Amino acid sequence: MEYHEAVDFLFDLRRFQVRPGIESAAALRSELDDPGDDIRFVQVAGSNGKGSTAKLTESVLREAGYSVGLYTSPHLETLNERIQVDGRPITDRAITEFVERVKPWLIDRAAAGEPLTFFEVVTLLGIWYFDRQDVDVAVLEVGLGGEFDATSVVDPVASCVTTVSLEHTSVLGDTIEEIATTKAKVAPAGDTPLVTGATGDALDALRADAGEVLTVGTDETADVTVGYDGRVTTTESQISVTMPGGDAADGGISYPAAFADGLDLSARLAL
């Protein structure tokens, strides 16, 4: 099989409609012998800002010395852009090998009336590739909602909901509260809080469903205060962060160097 044939096969899966649930993605993961069991996953959901948040997170983790997988959507030019390891896109050969491996199984599923969607299959392509590359951490951008998204086939060690707004109401719900509740399902197990920039009714719904929540915002009511001072020059931007228990002005909190370096690198790449 050639690369262009593999990609054409994947794109052809777009004809299948999205069905809420992770059962199909879980079945494909099982068929692939459950890749990703040893990977620590970070799941990024939200109505806006998912992609940039995922990339910021990946940048900080890489600066901290981890090998990091990044899964985002959509792509601009090639499918390979969606799946990266340490800043390098997945290879053509890996995509072709994956499609050769799963194509017969996917055809049988479709013939039985249980087809998988493009997003479900590409999500598992990412997880499979991250496993083969032996990454330490993988950052997954949620496609739609959270509870029934293919990325929820894994159990994250950390997750966030950037914002919540009315979107995809036919699938996620008719109100902000319903949509927030669906997104809250990405919350990690245990005592790790769900991180969010949501406010108002959305924040209340997230707290009600996810339990402990760490809020991020631009005012003093947030647990983590972020100030963005705009573009300082044509190549730089300035960001200040204040964490609980410290003040950015008096240096009450000491941040790991990788945190600042990762934010700086990601901001420069975006400009």
Placement of each model-derived feature along the sequence:
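ATP-dependent carboxylate-amine ligase catalytic core
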Residues: I22-D37, E63-V154, S170-G173, E178
